[in-house]
Amino acid sequence: MPPKTPRKTAATAAAAAAEPPAPPPPPPPEEDPEQDSGPEDLPLVRLEFEETEEPDFTALCQKLKIPDHVRERAWLTWEKVSSVDGVLGGYIQKKKELWGICIFIAAVDLDEMSFTFTELQKNIEISVHKFFNLLKEIDTSTKVDNAMSRLLKKYDVLFALFSKLERTCELIYLTQPSSSISTEINSALVLKVSWITFLLAKGEVLQMEDDLVISFQLMLCVLDYFIKLSPPMLLKEPYKTAVIPINGSPRTPRRGQNRSARIAKQLENDTRIIEVLCKEHECNIDEVKNVYFKNFIPFMNSLGLVTSNGLPEVENLSKRYEEIYLKNKDLDARLFLDHDKTLQTDSIDSFETQRTPRKSNLDEEVNVIPPHTPVRTVMNTIQQLMMILNSASDQPSENLISYFNNCTVNPKESILKRVKDIGYIFKEKFAKAVGQGCVEIGSQRYKLGVRLYYRVMESMLKSEEERLSIQNFSKLLNDNIFHMSLLACALEVVMATYSRSTSQNLDSGTDLSFPWILNVLNLKAFDFYKVIESFIKAEGNLTREMIKHLERCEHRIMESLAWLSDSPLFDLIKQSKDREGPTDHLESACPLNLPLQNNHTAADMYLSPVRSPKKKGSTTRVNSTANAETQATSAFQTQKPLKSTSLSLFYKKVYRLAYLRLNTLCERLLSEHPELEHIIWTLFQHTLQNEYELMRDRHLDQIMMCSMYGICKVKNIDLKFKIIVTAYKDLPHAVQETFKRVLIKEEEYDSIIVFYNSVFMQRLKTNILQYASTRPPTLSPIPHIPRSPYKFPSSPLRIPGGNIYISPLKSPYKISEGLPTPTKMTPRSRILVSIGESFGTSEKFQKINQMVCNSDRVLKRSAEGSNPPKPLKKLRFDIEGSDEADGSKHLPGESKFQQKLAEMTSTRTRMQKQKMNDSMDTSNKEEK
C-alpha cells in the first residue's frame, strides 16, 4: 500500500482550505487532497534535523559517505515510511534494513550515489531479493523503480550464469587430481579465473547488462580458452581427449608454464573444444563461433595478461574488474565465488531452478531430467525455433515466386529491396543497443527473422488460395504496411526467443523487448496489431510461450501503444464516426456477449474497409481478396462507405480486455457490491466509445480506475483511490507508472488522482451523475470472455458444453536424445488419454462432443419455441450405416439423435461386458 502522510504541512492545509466549493448540482465527491506524495515532494531542509536523527542512522550514513542533503532526504523518507501502519508489518522493527532502503531511494532520486549497491548491502546485511521485496512495498518514484528493475535484472542474469558456470566446471575439471597438479592449479582456481575473466569480457563486449544468450555464448568462449590452458590431467572426458592434440601429452604444470605463447595461434584457430562445449550445451555452433572470433579473441588480445602456472593472475584480473565495479556502483559479482549471503536467494523462490516432478512409478524407465534453469529454458526455446527454420530459406521459395508472378503488379523486386534495406537498419540499431562488436550477431538474428517472414507469408497465401480458389494477391502483396508488419512480427518472435522477455510483464524484459522492433522499423503499433492473429494462425509450430508472448504484445498495443497521438487509430475512428454517425459508431450495435470469431485474414485487416454495413435480411459475406479489392475500389462510388474490419475487431478485443481487468479488480474490491460491476463497465465502455479522446497518450487502466472511483462515489461506496491503486498494483501486468504518471495536458503529467479531478470528472461529470438518478442509463452488454483467442498447440482442448478433454500428444519439437520431449508419455499422461483403448482415437471424442453440443443446442431452442437459424454445418447421421450387430433396433418415431445416443449406449455396454469377461478370465487363470 502506498504510504500515507498523516500530518499535513501548512502549505497543504492552506491549499485545501483555498479550494472553491463545487457549484450545484454537486459533482462526484473528489478524493481527499492528501495524495501519494513521492520522495520528490519532500522538502530538502528541515529545522533541527540533527536533533531528530537517530545516532545509528547517522553512523550508517557516515560509513557510506552520504552527503548531508541526501541524508536529510533519506531521514524524511524513513519518517514517512515508519508512520504508515501495517504497510511493512514486522519489518519496522528492523530499522537498519529500512534505513538502507531509504538511503538508496534518496540517493537515486537526487543522483548522488556515493556508494556501491554491494557496500550498502554489506552495511545493512540484506540480500538482493529481500532488499527489493521491501522496496516494492514503499511508494517510490519512477526513477527509483527503473533503477531497481535494472539492478534486479542484472542480478538475475549473473546469478543464472554463475550457477551454470559452477555446474559446468564440475563436469569439466577433476576435483581431486594428482598431487603434483593440485598444489599449483586446481578446479577452484580455474573457476575463479574463468568467472572474473568472463565478467571483464561481458563488461567490454556487451552494453546490455541483462542479455542472457550472448552472455552465455561468451561464457562458453571463456571456458574454451581456459580448457586449452589447463593440463589434460586436470580434465574429465570428453575434454581431456579434445585438448591433448593442442597441449600434447599430459605434463606437469611447471613444464607447461611458458606454453601460452606457443599455443597462442592455436587458441585462436582451433575450435574442437568449442564444438564439444556447444554439443554438450546444445548451442548453435555458428553463433558461438561468431562471438568467439569477432568478440572474445580481440578482447583477450587487448588484455595483455600476465600468466602464472599457465593461467592469468587472479590479482591482476580482480584489479581490472574493481575499476568497472566502482564505476557502475552496483553489484560486486566476484562475491558469487564466495557464495556471499548478500547474493543468495531463497531456495523456495529461486530464480535459478524449477525442477520437474519425479516419476511415481518405480517400474517405469527413469529418464534423467535436467533442471529447468534460465539458461536451459532459453536454449531449448532457441532450438525449437531452429527446428522450425531449418528447412526455411532467407530467399523467397519457388512457391512464393509463383504467387508473385501471378500478381497483376509483381511485388518481388520491392519485397527483396525492402528486406535488404531493413536489414541495414536492423543491424545498426541492434549493435547500438547491444554493443558495437555485435553487428554480426544482429545479422544472424535478422536472417532468422527473414526466414520466418517468408515462411509465414507463404503459409498465409496457401491458406487464402485454398479458401478462395484464387492466386492473384496483388493488392495485399504490394501493400508496404502489410510487409513491414509481417517482417516486424517475425523479428519480434526471434528477438523474444533469444531473450527472457517472454515473462508475464513486457516491461521486465531486456532493452530489445517489445516495442523495440516497432521503433527500429518506424512502424505504428496499430498496424503491427493487425498481423498478430493471422501470423499465429499461419505458423502452426509456434510454441505456447511464444503465442502467449505475442498475445501480451497485442494487449500492450490495445492498452496504450495504439492510443499514442501519432497512431492511425484516431483517424480511423474519426472516419468511422463521420460515415456512420454516433448511433452506429464502432461496436454499439454489435452484441458483445457473443464469442469473438477468429476468422479474420491479413487481407481483411490490411485492405480494410472490406465490408458494407449489413442490411436486414442480408447474408452476403465478402471473403475473397479479389472481392475485397473490388469492394475497396468501389467504396468511393457508394452512398454509404464501408465499415472498417480492423477497427471493428480492434474495439471488440479492447472491450474484452478492458472488462476482464475490470472484473478482476471488482472481485478484489467490490465483492460485497456485485451490482456495481455492470454499472462501472457501462461508464467504462461509454468512455472508450464516445470519449475516446481521453485515451490519447494515456492507458486503458487509467480510465478503468477512474470509472470505478467515479461510480463508487455517486453510489456512496467508500472506496478511496489509494485502495484502488493498491489492488491494481497486484495485477500481473501492472506497473507503477500507470497511476503515478498520467497525462494532464500537453507535456504535463501528474498522479491519477489529479487526472480524475481535473480531466476525467470534468469531461464525464454529467454522465456520471446520471447513475445517481432514479432513471439511470441503459447498461452496456457484458462482453463474452474467452480463455484466450488463440489455441495453444500443447494445451488440453475443452469443448464447451461437454465433459471430454482432448490433449494432443504430439509436438513438432524433439530436442535431442536423453532430454524430455512432449512426445514422451509419462504414466500420468497415459492415464489422461487412454479412456477405453478399444473405443478409438481423439477424433472420435471430438465427434461425440460436436454431436452432444449441437443436439443440446437444438433441443434447447425447440423447447423455447423459437425457430433457430440453420447451422453452418449439419450433423448427418447415416442410418443405413449404423451398426446393428448388437441387435439394437430403432423405433420409427425416434429422432436421429435418439438413435445415435442408443447406439453409443449400446457400444459402451458391450465394452463394459468385454472388460468384465476379461477380468473373469484373468481371475480364473490365477486360480488355476
Curated annotation (Swiss-Prot):
Cellular component, GO, one term: spindle
Source species: Homo sapiens (Human)
Region (Domain C), start-end ranges: 771-928
GO biological process, one term: neuron apoptotic process
Pfam families from the UniProt entry: DUF3452, RB_A, RB_B, Rb_C
Post-translational note: Phosphorylated by CDK6 and CDK4, and subsequently by CDK2 at Ser-567 in G1, thereby releasing E2F1 which is then able to activate cell growth. Dephosphorylated at the late M phase. SV40 large T antigen, HPV E7 and adenovirus E1A bind to the underphosphorylated, active form of pRb. Phosphorylation at Thr-821 and Thr-826 promotes interaction between the C-terminal domain C and the Pocket domain, and thereby inhibits interactions with heterodimeric E2F/DP transcription factor complexes. Dephosphorylated at Ser-795 by calcineruin upon calcium stimulation.
Listed Low complexity bias regions: 8-19
Summary of the tissues where the protein is detected: Expressed in the retina. Expressed in foreskin keratinocytes (at protein level).
Annotated protein name in UniProt: Retinoblastoma-associated protein
Entry remark concerning the domains of this protein: The Pocket domain binds to the threonine-phosphorylated domain C, thereby preventing interaction with heterodimeric E2F/DP transcription factor complexes.
Highest taxon above the source species: Eukaryota
Disease: Childhood cancer retinoblastoma: Congenital malignant tumor that arises from the nuclear layers of the retina. It occurs in about 1:20'000 live births and represents about 2% of childhood malignancies. It is bilateral in about 30% of cases. Although most RB appear sporadically, about 20% are transmitted as an autosomal dominant trait with incomplete penetrance. The diagnosis is usually made before the age of 2 years when strabismus or a gray to yellow reflex from pupil ('cat eye') is investigated.
Location of region: Disordered: 1-42, 610-632, 860-928
Compartment(s): Nucleus; Cytoplasm
